[in-house]
Amino acid sequence: MNMPQLSTIQIGDHELAYLDNKLTSAVTPTIVMLPGWCGDHHSFSELIPQLNDTHRVVAVNWRGHAPVPHDVSDFGYAEQAQDALAILDAIGVDEFLPVSASHGGWALVQLLVDAGPARARAGVVLDWLMRRPTPEFTAALLSLQDPEGWVDSCRALFHTWRPNDSDWVESRVERAKEFGFDMWARSGRVISGAYGEHGTPLEFMKTITPERHIRHLFSTPSDSDYVAPQEAFASENEWFSYALLGGTSHFPHLEMPDRVAAHIVELAKNTYQAGAMR
C-alpha cells in the first residue's frame, strides 16, 4: 500500500498537514507518528507501509514544517503536543499509540499527559538521547542557533547520525536548508531547554501520571555506559522497556522498519487489545 495522501487542517492560526490512511477495518489503537524537529511525514516512509494493512496510521507534521516549510511564531514541545491532539480530535481518533522520532519524544511524553490514559496507554520513542547531552552535543545545539554556522552544524550532526553515507548526508543538508535557520535555531533552543528543565527523558517520563508503558528502540550508542542506565531504569520501573536493535544509524525506522513495526504491534497488542500494562 502506498503512502496516504497529505491532508491539511486549520488549527487555530496554523494550517497543519498530516497523513491518514483512514483504515476502517483497523485494529485498536491508531498508530500516530510524530517526527523529530525539522523533519516531516517522509521520515516514516519506510515504517508506515509496514503497518498500513492492519492499523489506522496517522502521521502528524509540526507547525511550520509542511506541506511547505514556512515561518511561524515561536513554539515548543508543549505546543507540538497540543497540535497533535487537536488533529486527532478533529479527525475522530480515539485510542492511539504515538511513535516519535528522536526529540519528537518530548512532544510524545507531553501528548501522553494531555490525552490521558483512556486514549493513550503507551508510546514508542525511536532513538531518543536518554542521558544528559554530552559537551559535543550541547555545542552542536548552540551552533544550530548561529546564523553563520548552522548549516555546517547540521552536516556534522548528519555525519554522526548516519556515518559512511556521504550522499545521504548531503541530501539531508539540502533538505535542512528548506526548513531554514529559524526552525533549526528553534530546535536547538527547545531541545536544550528540555534537557535543562527535565534532566533526561527518563526523568521526564516519570512525571506522567498515571504511568504509561514507553518503549525505547535504538541502535546507537550501544556501549554499556549508555545501555546500563536504561537497564537499571527498566528494572525499577516496569512501565519502561528498551530494545537495542543492532543497526548502525540514528534512524531505526528507516534502517529496519520491519523490526520497529513488530515492536509497535506487540506493544499495541499487550497494552490496548489485552487491556493491561505489561
Curated annotation (Swiss-Prot):
Residues that coordinate or bind substrate? 103
SUPFAM superfamilies per record: alpha/beta-Hydrolases
Gene Ontology molecular function: dioxygenase activity
The answer to whether keyword Secreted applies is no
Name the site position(s) for Increases basicity of active site His.
127
Q: InterPro entries under this entry? A: AB_hydrolase_1, AB_hydrolase_fold, Carboxylesterase_BioH
Describe what upregulates or represses it. Up-regulated by PQS.
Give the positions the UniProt entry annotates as the active site: 250
Catalysis: reaction(s): 2-heptyl-3-hydroxy-4(1H)-quinolone + O2 = N-octanoylanthranilate + CO + H(+)
UniProt entry tagged with the keyword Oxidoreductase: yes
- Taxonomically, the superkingdom here is Bacteria
Keywords carried by this UniProt record? Dioxygenase, Oxidoreductase, Plasmid
Q: What is the protein name for this chain? A: 2-heptyl-3-hydroxy-4-quinolone dioxygenase AqdC1
